[in-house]
Amino acid sequence: MIPRTPHRLARAALLLATAALVSGCADPGPKNIPTVSGEFGKRPTVVMPKLPAPKQARMTVLKEGDGPVTRKGQVIVTDVDMRLWESGKPLMDTYRLEQPTTAVLDGKHVARTWDQSLIGRKAGSRVLLVSPATHGFGPNGMAPAQVKPSDHMVLVFDVIGGYDPKQQVSGGSSASGAASAHPAVSVRPGQEPVLSDWGPAPKKFAARTLVAGTGPELKPGQRMVVQFSGVEWGKKGSFNSTYRRSGPNGFLLKDRALLPGWYEGLTGRRVGSRVLLTVPAGHRPGFTHTDGGLAAPKNRPVAYVVDILDAR
């Protein structure tokens, strides 16, 4: 046993005191970061500190999800609350619109800060981004006219998931046609569905499962992710289609947040299903568009082919 001399005891005491001093002076982390509260999928409460905004973009994962990791080249379906640091003025709020946004992470469509914040995140994650306005928008970092270059933005993302732009349900064609109440549906891998052999326009709403999925059932209030094509009855070509835009889109499963026929036709369907919705003219009297901007031909019968890819 080594004897504890006064010299050794003094040195030990000095080391302990130094350790305590270092611990007490350790950097607790940046203080100029907003406080964010609230649960995933609900509009967050954001409180800004009374401090200048950080000069550089800063990203923080507030909650790590448990779903698949997002990848570059995918489209990311996410809710987002975006506001100005300086005034708290809201710039974008998908929670109020009741429709998530879709970000194409290919280095061209959104700002680099979005790529850095959303690539490599697990579905179900909540992410905070604080960024100078000139780096917070895309493409090319262009901010809207009402935002000054000296402003800073605060964004809270609730990441629903990442999806391949042409992702769709596995399954072939449906051999309906004029003899039935449904058009024939032909689907080739990675391509928009083609509807043909139209019969008489529907007088009643109907939903038909073309491919039965095996995933969880859709429940009211969930965010669902779909590929879809909408076609006016008897016409060629779609009036609205995710295949012709960015790819999979997210929607809140709530009656007034969806196109006529979607809520009753998709609630209870399983993820992995392909569903044909035939909607008569005037199915929801007075409908013009959703708060998220979804619209359909007024007083016209339509058909939708909807691939249910995910739900959260």
Spans of model-derived segments:
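Cross-family detector of peptidyl-prolyl cis-trans isomerase
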Residues: I2-R312
